[in-house]
Curated annotation (Swiss-Prot):
SUPFAM superfamilies: PRTase-like (SSF53271)
Native source organism of the sequence: Xylella fastidiosa (strain M12)
Entry's family note: Belongs to the purine/pyrimidine phosphoribosyltransferase family. PyrE subfamily.
Annotated InterPro entries: OPRT (IPR023031), Or_phspho_trans_dom (IPR004467), PRibTrfase_dom (IPR000836), PRTase-like (IPR029057)
Alphabetic keyword roster: Glycosyltransferase, Magnesium, Pyrimidine biosynthesis, Transferase
Alphabetical GO biological process terms: 'de novo' pyrimidine nucleobase biosynthetic process; 'de novo' UMP biosynthetic process; pyrimidine ribonucleoside biosynthetic process
Record-given protein name: Orotate phosphoribosyltransferase
Gene: pyrE
Function comment: Catalyzes the transfer of a ribosyl phosphate group from 5-phosphoribose 1-diphosphate to orotate, leading to the formation of orotidine monophosphate (OMP).
Length: 219
């Protein structure tokens, strides 16, 4: 497993962004783990998370000159990622949207650099149904930008339903043709748990969950 994947999973565990147990998901499934990026809630944690994002994005050789953060969770992620790239001496443009239209001041729904003519990376924490990402794609294209990649923290690699064996990530890539990179996947989480003696008791429930709900192809 790549070092940045291990760093991310350990950071998530230490930050309580990654928890093990029994969790009822919005889908009604009982999951043996839960991921909540809201627990990266300090400057140090967010900076460390941004390093992991940048490492994953660089490993995927994504081509972009602007980072777009969908409201709301994508906003601090995009800002932190742009700061991390500045630290690496690459100055990227930054834009995010607001969900409510502002009718005074600068107005509109976009804050930051103009999107027109830009190659744009969208960043978010996870892709569940893909609604926020699809809205971001619509906003970007309407503003004259070109979405060239999507980055998320964790890819759950989970089928949509028993009759639809694609994950939300696979469905989004098939629909849009835009590559999605994740810092880590459920497969990485399984390997991480297997290699950590203190987490050994969670391996079998995770494996059973992946066997039942996991996608057949890697994504």
């Amino acid at each position: 497993m790549s070092h940045y994947r291990q760093r991310f999973l350990q950071l998530a565990l230490d930050s309580n962004a990654l928890c093990f147990g029994e969790f009822t998901l919005k889908s009604g499934r009982i999951s043996p783990y839960f991921f909540n990026a809201g627990h990266f809630n300090s400057g140090a944690k967010t900076a460390a998370l941004a390093q992991c994002y940048a490492d994953a994005i660089d490993a995927a050789n994504m081509n972009f000159d602007l980072v777009f953060g969908p409201a709301y969770k994508g906003i601090p992620l995009a800002t932190a990622l742009a700061c991390e790239y500045a630290r690496r001496e690459r100055d990227l443009l930054l834009t995010f949207n607001r969900k409510e239209v502002k009718n005074h001041g600068e107005g509109g729904t976009l804050i930051g650099a103009p999107l027109n003519g830009r190659k744009i990376l969208i960043i978010d924490d996870v892709i569940t149904a893909g609604t926020a990402i699809r809205e971001a794609l619509r906003i970007i294209r309407n503003a004259g930008g070109t979405p060239t990649g999507i980055a998320v923290a964790l890819n759950r690699q989970e089928i949509a339903s028993e009759t639809n064996r694609q994950s939300s990530v696979q469905a989004l890539m098939a629909e849009t043709g835009i590559p999605v990179v994740a810092i880590a996947t459920l497969s990485d989480l399984l390997a991480f748990v297997e290699e950590n003696a203190s987490l050994a008791k969670f391996y079998e429930p995770l494996l059973a969950y992946k066997t039942h709900y996991g996608t057949e192809a890697s994504d």
